[in-house]
């Protein structure tokens, strides 16, 4: 029986933990698969995805900076992917790619199941308005948050995300310059790559954003998350959480879409957490 082919596409992608995660899921469930990392610059992504499909590819994950391009290339989209305008999971079906987004449910599962947070009634500050932010925003709204404030260096992108989400009384955009006047939040989510250069000053944000319940969450993990989590700890956030748990949970959702079984994420997460020092950045 031929081995089923899967991959993660990104640029860069050599750092990705997805091949190791899916290999562990395969061993756990007894499913034999070939999962590789494929580096595809944005201008070559469409052709690379077609070559993968022509070679028997059955499913793919998509990481930065290709999630919005994957949305455009998919022949059909789930409601979550359509609302997000970004795709992180592709399923091959009858010669076509179906687009899904498991980022949001991965984040919510990590926060609620692993960290025990109750998101209902919470006020959320979302930093960023690109593919990562678009992937998690709908799921946070569905989890019962009260208000989401979107802040992005490009205000037009923040406005566009708010328009896409379509809840004007609940989701608003604000300028970075307004951070000092926004009040405090129970959840602050960094969906930017601002920490990639490891600049400690990248998150020089006002301490007034934080209250006694605040959880600060970076969708990145490893070195890219250091600057934001350092700010979170200096601001005395109750929780400072990186994106490793979200990565494992969204991978499990993708695995379930492809194989019809959801693996146990706890042992995989524990093994990766033990290797935390070698982690680089988020999928």
From Swiss-Prot:
One of its GO terms (molecular function) is NADP binding. Keywords: Amino-acid biosynthesis, Aromatic amino acid biosynthesis, NADP, Oxidoreductase. The active site is at residue 67. NADP(+) binds at residues 79, 128-132, 223, 243. The keyword Oxidoreductase applies. SUPFAM superfamilies: Aminoacid dehydrogenase-like, N-terminal domain (SSF53223), NAD(P)-binding Rossmann-fold domains (SSF51735). The keyword Signal does not apply. CDD domains: NAD_bind_Shikimate_DH. GO terms for biological process: amino acid biosynthetic process; aromatic amino acid family biosynthetic process; chorismate biosynthetic process; shikimate metabolic process. Homodimer. HAMAP family: Shikimate_DH_AroE. Belongs to the shikimate dehydrogenase family. This is Shikimate dehydrogenase (NADP(+)). The lineage of its organism: Bacteria, Pseudomonadati, Pseudomonadota, Gammaproteobacteria, Lysobacterales.
